[in-house]
Swiss-Prot record:
Possible role in transport between endoplasmic reticulum and Golgi. Coiled coil: none annotated. Belongs to the ERGIC family. Pfam families: COPIIcoated_ERV, ERGIC_N. It comes from Homo sapiens. The chain crosses the membrane at residues 34-54, 320-340. Keywords: Cytoplasm, Endoplasmic reticulum, ER-Golgi transport, Golgi apparatus, Membrane, Nucleus, Transmembrane, Transmembrane helix, Transport. May form a heteromeric complex composed of ERGIC1, ERGIC2 and ERGIC3. Interacts with ERGIC3, the interaction is required for the stable expression of both proteins. May interact with EEF1A1. It is a multi-pass membrane protein. Ubiquitously expressed. Residues 55-319 are lumenal. This is Endoplasmic reticulum-Golgi intermediate compartment protein 2.
Length: 377
């Protein structure tokens, strides 16, 4: 009884077979069918290779949300060279809460030569070229994000020659931690001293003729320091044409969480607007000579995530390519073969012309029976 039920079940399953097998003796092969099959297999191979390259590629997904972190500190990474001796300049930060962060908390003053060596000039030229391309091709930023920690650092290479020239500039580099409110990082004449109403600089002790705020920004970033990330002001160089010149940078900082297959970092992107002018109180251009970077933080936070096509989606797309090409080429081959047969082979005039009479074995004839040519039945 069980065997009988099993046979019934198997026969029922066989009847439900959606892929019936045609015996090879009933399959007709042709040169045109082989040509179409060759084209189909070649197309499938090319599309499969292209689809696999798409599967291997990644893209950056951007999401936006309100930044709810107000209590943490903001890190500012600085590497700026000013064409003045270190004893003549001072750097510090003053925010909207009147909180002063002195440069002694994390910055190093290093005497150096302002002019770059040949190798350093080549580095600066390449960095400026990348900056110009980034301003035109914004999608290149995705490539930079994905290459983080994958390439070498973008820091200024050390001087390869032992210059006998005495130091005529000051390299200010390091990092500071400030409150997450708008502030002003500035480099001006004289060392900073605390003041009940803010702070002041001892500019009176410096000769006015020694003022020269020509400067080079080798690196400026906010948040966690991520090597190989190029920031908007990296490689910037400004030459002062007057002793009383002020350089201003208005910066909008956007908190950014970066998640790639290489790293995860809490960093910050920023945009900048530059302005420079000569201080002339008689002409109404007031201010103080120096370099001023006024930054403000955006209330929005950007999450940048590197994404990859899931395997199931790749598999479905691959099945669609194979099945679609098989179905389409089969249909096109059938239509083409039908058209060729109509024009050249089957339905020529006279192929179905009836004969006048049909002889039978008993000797009589039938003139009304249509008969194909070469047919004796």
């Amino acid at each position: 009884m069980r065997r009988l039920n099993r046979k019934k079940t198997l026969s029922l399953v066989k009847e439900l077979d959606a892929f019936p097998k045609v015996p090879e003796s009933y399959v007709e092969t042709s040169a045109s069918g082989g040509t179409v099959s060759l084209i189909a297999f070649t197309t499938m191979a090319l599309l499969t290779i292209m689809e696999f390259s798409v599967y291997q590629d990644t893209w950056m997904k951007y999401e936006y949300e309100v930044d709810k972190d107000f209590s943490s500190k903001l890190r500012i990474n600085i590497d700026i060279t000013v064409a003045m001796k270190c004893q003549y300049v001072g750097a510090d930060v003053l925010d909207l809460a009147e909180t002063m962060v002195a440069s002694a908390d994390g910055l190093v003053y290093e005497p150096t030569v302002f002019d770059l060596s040949p190798q350093q000039k080549e580095w600066q030229r390449m960095l400026q070229l990348i900056q110009s391309r980034l301003q035109e091709e914004h999608s290149l930023q995705d490539v930079i994000f994905k290459s983080a920690f994958k390439s070498t650092s973008t820091a200024l290479p050390p001087r390869e020659d032992d210059s006998s020239q005495s130091p005529n500039a000051c390299r200010i580099h390091g990092h500071l931690y400030v409150n997450k409110v708008a502030g002003n990082f500035h480099i001006t004449v004289g060392k900073a001293i605390p003041h009940p109403r803010g702070h002041a600089h001892l500019a009176a002790l410096v000769n006015h003729e020694s003022y020269n705020f020509s400067h080079r920004i080798d690196h400026l970033s906010f948040g966690e320091l991520v090597p190989a990330i190029i920031n908007p002001l990296d490689g910037t160089e400004k030459i002062a044409i007057d002793h009383n010149q002020m350089f201003q940078y208005f910066i909008t900082v956007v908190p950014t969480k970066l998640h790639t297959y290489k790293i995860s970092a809490d960093t910050h992107q920023f945009s900048v607007t530059e302005r420079e002018r000569i201080i002339n109180h008689a002409a109404g251009s007031h201010g103080v000579s120096g370099i001023f970077m006024k930054y403000d933080l955006s209330s929005l936070m950007v999450t940048v995530t590197e994404e990859h096509m899931p395997f199931w989606q790749f598999f479905v797309r691959l099945c669609g390519i194979v099945g679609g090409i098989f179905s389409t080429t089969g249909m096109l081959h059938g239509i083409g073969k039908f058209i060729v047969e109509i024009i050249c082979c089957r339905f020529r005039l006279g192929s179905y012309k009836p004969v006048n009479s049909v002889p039978f074995e008993d000797g009589h004839t039938d003139n009304h029976l249509p008969l194909l040519e070469n047919n004796t039945h």
